[in-house]
């Protein structure tokens, strides 16, 4: 019979042991724009393509990299509306933790809370899985951290990772270039070079976004002028 008769059932396993709706959610991630993250010795960088649906869209209104807390940022591949829902839920969790314990939420705990929300949407009736994967970058008492969270709710800590439509080329490139003693500026250069692998058209500060966090524990998104400077350095 195959898996097709189970493709509309969220809570029923197919004979091959898959939840087919999660497979479809991963397909949505795989067709999204390429995003990547690199953990350096002194910080973390996340970067993504930012292709606009039309030249008439105001590029300033499209922000793929977001703050979750002052020291945690996130980027996605997949469906933008789903990402915004998860950002809102994650920020609420972080605010509740801060209010209760009077200290910022650890990166690992916020990732776990977000992954729990995503997992609950794989086993509940009347909902569908989130069609996004997330890369979460943070810096806390345990140092720089990079996590990837997938639609199934699974999450892992990574030294460097990529997701989206160019994932295989990007991961191959990262495997060749990554070193554990890499510093933050080197990681930004590597992130740009990784995005250039398979990039359609000319890469510029208008069609990529980069976020970073260092030992100051302040996550920020680079300005177009800063991205232009880094692009000039890797030419």
UniProtKB/Swiss-Prot annotation:
Covalent link Glycyl lysine isopeptide (Lys-Gly) (interchain with G-Cter in ubiquitin), residues: 64
GO biological process: response to zinc ion; ubiquitin-dependent protein catabolic process
Assigned protein family: Belongs to the peptidase T1A family.
Pfam families per the UniProt record, alphabetical: Proteasome, Proteasome_A_N
Subunit-structure text: Component of the 20S core complex of the 26S proteasome. The 26S proteasome is composed of a core protease (CP), known as the 20S proteasome, capped at one or both ends by the 19S regulatory particle (RP/PA700). The 20S proteasome core is composed of 28 subunits that are arranged in four stacked rings, resulting in a barrel-shaped structure. The two end rings are each formed by seven alpha subunits, and the two central rings are each formed by seven beta subunits. The catalytic chamber with the active sites is on the inside of the barrel.
Function: The proteasome is a multicatalytic proteinase complex which is characterized by its ability to cleave peptides with Arg, Phe, Tyr, Leu, and Glu adjacent to the leaving group at neutral or slightly basic pH. The proteasome has an ATP-dependent proteolytic activity.
Domain of life from the UniProt record: Eukaryota
Record has Ion transport as a keyword: no
SUPFAM superfamilies, sorted: N-terminal nucleophile aminohydrolases (Ntn hydrolases)
Keyword Nucleus: yes
One term under GO cellular component: cytosol
Keywords from the UniProt entry: Cytoplasm, Isopeptide bond, Nucleus, Proteasome, Ubl conjugation
Annotated compartments: Cytoplasm; Nucleus
Gene encoding the protein: PAB1
Protein name: Proteasome subunit alpha type-2-A
């Amino acid at each position: 019979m195959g898996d097709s008769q189970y493709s509309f059932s969220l809570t029923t396993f197919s004979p091959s042991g898959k939840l087919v709706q999660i497979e479809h959610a991963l397909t949505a991630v795989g067709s999204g724009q390429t995003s990547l993250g690199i953990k350096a010795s002194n910080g973390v960088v996340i970067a993504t393509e930012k292709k606009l649906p039309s030249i008439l869209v105001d590029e300033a209104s499209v922000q793929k990299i977001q703050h979750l807390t002052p020291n945690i940022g996130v980027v996605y591949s997949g469906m933008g509306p789903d990402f915004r829902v998860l950002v809102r839920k994650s920020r609420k969790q972080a605010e509740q933790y801060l209010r209760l314990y009077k200290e910022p939420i650890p990166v690992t705990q916020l990732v776990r809370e977000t992954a729990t929300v995503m997992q609950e949407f794989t086993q509940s009736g009347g909902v569908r899985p989130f069609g996004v994967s997330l890369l979460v970058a943070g810096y806390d008492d345990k140092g720089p951290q990079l996590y990837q969270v997938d639609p199934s709710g699974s999450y892992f800590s990574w030294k460097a990772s990529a997701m989206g439509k160019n994932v295989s080329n990007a991961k191959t490139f990262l495997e060749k270039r990554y070193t554990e003693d890499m510093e933050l500026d080197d990681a930004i250069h590597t992130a740009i070079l990784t995005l250039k692998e398979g990039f359609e058209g000319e890469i510029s500060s208008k069609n990529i976004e980069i976020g970073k966090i260092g030992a100051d524990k302040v996550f920020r998104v680079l300005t177009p002028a800063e991205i232009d400077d880094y692009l000039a350095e890797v030419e």
